[in-house]
Structure formats: structure tokens, C-alpha cells
Curated annotation (Swiss-Prot):
Record keywords: Acetylation, Cytoplasm, Disease variant, Intellectual disability, Methyltransferase, RNA-binding, S-adenosyl-L-methionine, Transferase
Predominant place of localization: cytoplasm
PANTHER family: NOP2 YEAST -RELATED NOL1/NOP2/FMU SUN DOMAIN-CONTAINING, TRNA (CYTOSINE(72)-C(5))-METHYLTRANSFERASE NSUN6
Domain of life: Eukaryota
Task of the protein: S-adenosyl-L-methionine-dependent methyltransferase that specifically methylates the C5 position of cytosine 72 in tRNA(Thr)(TGT) and tRNA(Cys)(GCA). In vitro also methylates tRNA(Thr)(AGT). Methylation requires, in the acceptor stem region, the presence of the 3'-CCA terminus, the target site C72, the discriminator base U73, and the second and third base pairs (2:71 and 3:70) in the tRNA substrates.
Gene: NSUN6
Enzyme Commission code(s) on record: 2.1.1.-
Protein name: tRNA (cytosine(72)-C(5))-methyltransferase NSUN6
Effect listed in the UniProt record for changing D323A: Abolishes tRNA methyltransferase activity. Abolishes S-Adenosylmethionine binding
Length: 469
């Protein structure tokens, strides 16, 4: 059920996306009316959260069943005794799925209001509480302990510290203020704690702030799928070319039983430190993270470096993951994007530079997995078509497990090639209306089918590098 307006985009950005989703191949296959309907549905679904919260179990430190039991206890506490089921994914054995309850339509709105920024609002819809830096505006006499209605300023028009706001805002639910208005807007830079504890969110999801941090990693379903598609083996040398914050890096290491070598690169120092922190927290020793630009990761002088630091000699890695920087247009919920067409379209050249480096660094018969969390044709299927033409040594491969839909028409790929891709399309199923009664009556297989389809927008392609002749 759609309760929020469709994602707010600049008109030129919406037209740019529409051209991709109503390209000649799609219109020929579906008809103009159906293609347009699917595109409008997509825009509506992007502003809503997925119907499941997905967490990956760190199987390096604990069994899935043990962590599932601990998590059930945690959910009982958070949900005041409500019995929300936890499902283990049948194809991704280290993934647990928690259904989201909502939208809850009978929440009474309060006179006392707080306005949060769009990014904070998106996090609230995925189970987060409101932290003080995310609060943009609050009612004049708000005190600690007050019941507050929380709204998202989806267009970024509310002025910091305002006492009221009449612009476009979306109701996120009610919570209890942990701080007064005066404390929130005191100007103290160290004020980073919780501002509002959400007690009646429109979408009820668990909060994972400091919950079983050594055993669980919060990850969208397609993101957890990627490392399984890569299928790393113990003893191999793996490269995660754009690794921050380390979710996929640590997953790769866990799937290898921490045996082998996982090299993680990112060009921003603080992000690399986060990868190292996550590896340490999860007890993984096979990861080495470096602050380095992935486009320059190929060593040009062919002199072997005994230290094993970047840049690397060509054909150094058994498997490479390129989870590429992208426009992120598949993220959910996302009620507004202020980017220009130039910004949305700016990633394709960078992705190709990274792809070129990845192909050079991959051993013959090695596996390369390319993924993005966006929905654009230019960053997904068009990149696959370009790669297959640019690098005759690459062959597109079927993926296992195959959970997402096939690739989108429009880049000139054959039907067989499209079937070898995985595209997660947020418009694939109607938005669910989930309450405790419907959960009790739901069949497990129906819930799993919904979890596979109602996710963020995401794309995965798998290649093998042919043997040199």
C-alpha cells in the first residue's frame, strides 16, 4: 500500500530515468502504456521501505541458529512482547529476514512536532531512532519526555532551529523526546546522542544500534547475495576494489573461513579505517585494507612488490568484486533526490575505469562480479554490453543463487544474456500492508518470495576471464 508521495526528483532527472525505462526495446516488448505504468510504480515504491529487514550472521564467530535465538530475545524486548518471526533464507544460509510491520495508519498525530532531515527520515523508516544532529526543527516548548510527532522534510526546505514548518513534510510516527528544544539547538558540537526515541513508527522495524555487533551485520538482501555469487574459496586471493564500509569484504572473508587473503581498497582514509574496525570487530584476520584509488591499482612497471601493497601486478587475483560507486538511485526508502542529470549520469566513466583495472588484475579463469545499488540502464546493462565488447576475454556467467529478476532490455543484450544477470526491481510486487494478523496467517514460502522481490534496486553481473591462448 502506497502511503507516501512518489520520490521527488528534478523534472530533468525524472525524464532521464523515464527514457531508460521506456526505451525502444521495452516499449516494443511491453507496450507504451504498460512501460509507463511500471515506471510510475517504481517511483512510488522507491519512497517506501522494503518489506523486510535483512541481517547477515557472522558465521566465523557463531552459528546461525545461536544468533537467531539471541535475536528473537532482542526483538521480544524491542517490540514489547510482540511475536515477530525471523526467517532464515533458504538460498543464503547466513541471512536472516525480519518482516516489517506497516504501514500503521491509526497512529494519533501530536500537537508537538519535530522535523528531521530527509536522510534521518529514511533511517527512521528502517528502524532507527532520531539522533540530535538529524533534528532540523522542533515545537517551541518541546521538553524532554514529551510525546512528539516526527516528520521528514523531504525537500530540504526547513530552516535549522525553526519553531514551526508548513512546507512539504511526511509523517514518520511518534516518539518520546530525550532532550528539550533548548538543548537540541544549543549549538554544542558534541551533542550527538539520541534526540527522540521512536515509540510508534509508521513502519515498525527493529533498531540495530549496538545489537549483537560481533554477530550481525545489517545488509540489504542483494548486498548479502553478491558475495555468494562471487563464491570465494579458502586459500584464494580476493580483491574488493571499492570496499567501504566493509560489509561485503567481511562477508567474503567469512565465506572463505578466514583462510586466504582479502585485499580491500578505498580512496578515502576514514572509510578504510571503518573497514579495519569492522574486520577487527568480526574477528577476521585475512583482510588487508589500503587507502588507494582503485583506478590506479594496476602496477605498470612489472617489478614485483614483496610487500603485497597496491598497486598490484596484472593477473594477481583469483576473484574480484567491483561493487562500483554509483548514483544510488535504487536505495529505499528515498523520498527525494536533489541531484542534477549531470550528477546522476556522472558515474559511468568512473565505473569503466575501475572495470578496466579489474580485468587487468584478474587471473585467467578468474571470476569478476560487478554490482551497483542503482536502477539506471547506463550503469548496469549498458556497462555489461560495453564490457563484453571492450574485453573479448570476458564471458558472462550464470549466477548462483539466482534470486533477482533478469536484466532490463535496452542495451542490446540477448535474451540469454539478460537471463544471466540479476536485477532487483522495487516495482516487481505491490507494496504490502503487513500487520500481526497477516503475519500469523502468512505462509513461509509467500514471505520468502516477497523478501526476494520487495528489496532495494540492485544489479549484479558475473564474468569469467578466458584462459590466454
Amino acid at each position: 500500500m502506497s502511503i507516501f508521495p512518489k520520490i521527488s526528483l528534478r523534472p530533468e532527472v525524472e525524464n532521464y530515468l523515464k527514457e531508460g525505462f521506456m526505451n525502444k526495446e521495452i516499449v516494443t516488448a511491453l507496450g507504451k502504456q504498460e512501460a509507463e505504468r511500471k515506471f510510475e510504480t517504481l517511483l512510488k515504491h522507491l519512497s517506501h521501505p522494503p518489506s523486510f529487514t535483512t541481517v547477515r550472521v557472522n558465521t566465523h564467530l557463531a552459528s546461525v541458529q545461536h544468533v537467531k535465538n539471541l535475536l528473537l530475545d532482542e526483538l521480544q524486548k524491542q517490540f514489547n512482547g510482540l511475536s515477530v518471526p525471523i526467517l532464515q533464507h533458504p538460498d543464503l544460509q547466513d541471512v536472516l529476514l525480519i518482516p516489517v510491520i506497516g504501514p500503521r495508519k491509526n497512529i494519533k498525530k501530536q500537537q508537538c512536532e519535530a522535523i528531521v532531515g530527509a536522510q534521518c527520515g529514511n533511517a527512521v523508516l528502517r528502524g532507527a531512532h532520531v539522533y540530535a544532529p538529524g533534528i532540523v526543527s522542533a515545537s517551541q516548548f518541546m521538553k524532554a519526555g514529551d510525546v512528539i510527532s516526527v516528520y521528514s522534510d523531504i525537500k530540504g526546505k526547513c530552516k535549522k532551529g525553526a519553531k514551526e514548518f508548513d512546507g512539504t513534510k511526511v509523517f514518520l510516527g511518534n516518539g518520546i523526546s530525550e532532550l528539550s528544544r533548548k538543548e537540541i539547538f544549543s549549538g554544542l558540537p558534541e551533542l550527538k546522542g539520541m534526540g527522540i526515541r521512536m515509540t510508534e513508527p509508521v513502519y515498525l522495524s527493529p533498531s540495530f544500534d549496538s545489537v549483537l555487533p560481533r554477530y550481525l551485520f545489517l545488509q540489504n538482501l542483494p548486498s548479502a547475495l553478491v558475495s555468494h555469487v562471487l563464491n570465494p574459496q579458502p586459500g584464494e586471493k580476493i580483491l574488493d576494489l571499492c570496499a567501504a564500509p566493509g560489509g561485503k569484504t567481511t562477508h567474503i572473508a567469512a565465506l572463505m573461513h578466514d583462510q586466504g587473503e582479502v585485499i580491500a581498497l578505498d580512496k578515502i582514509f576514514n572509510k578504510v579505517e571503518k573497514i579495519k574496525q569492522n574486520a577487527l570487530l568480526l574477528g577476521l584476520n585475512s583482510i588487508r585494507a589500503f587507502c588507494f584509488d582503485g583506478t590506479k591499482a594496476v602496477k605498470l612497471d612489472m617489478v614485483e612488490d614483496t610487500e603485497g601493497e597496491p598497486p598490484f601486478l596484472p593477473e594477481s587475483f583469483d576473484r574480484i568484486l567491483l561493487d562500483a560507486p554509483c548514483s544510488g538511485m535504487g536505495q529505499r526508502p528515498n523520498m527525494a533526490c536533489t541531484w542534477s542529470v549531470k550528477e546522476v549520469a556522472s558515474y559511468q566513466p568512473l565505473q569503466r575505469k575501475l572495470f578496466t583495472a579489474a580485468v587487468q588484475l584478474l587471473k585467467p579463469e578468474g571470476v569478476l562480479v560487478y554490482s551497483t545499488c542503482t536502477i539506471t540502464l547506463a550503469e548496469n546493462e549498458e556497462q555489461v554490453a560495453w564490457a563484453l565488447t571492450k574485453f573479448p576475454c570476458l564471458q558472462l556467467q550464470p549466477q548462483e543463487p539466482q534470486i533477482g529478476g533478469e536484466g532490463m532490455r535496452g542495451a542490446g543484450l540477448s535474451c540469454e544474456q539478460l537471463k544471466q544477470l540479476q536485477r532487483f526491481d522495487p516495482s516487481a510486487v505491490p507494496l504490502p500492508d503487513t500487520d500481526m494478523d497477516s503475519l500469523r496467517e502468512a505462509r513461509r514460502e509467500d514471505m520468502l518470495r516477497l523478501a526476494n522481490k520487495d528489496s532495494i534496486g540492485f544489479f549484479i553481473a558475473k564474468f569469467v576471464k578466458c584462459k590466454s591462448t
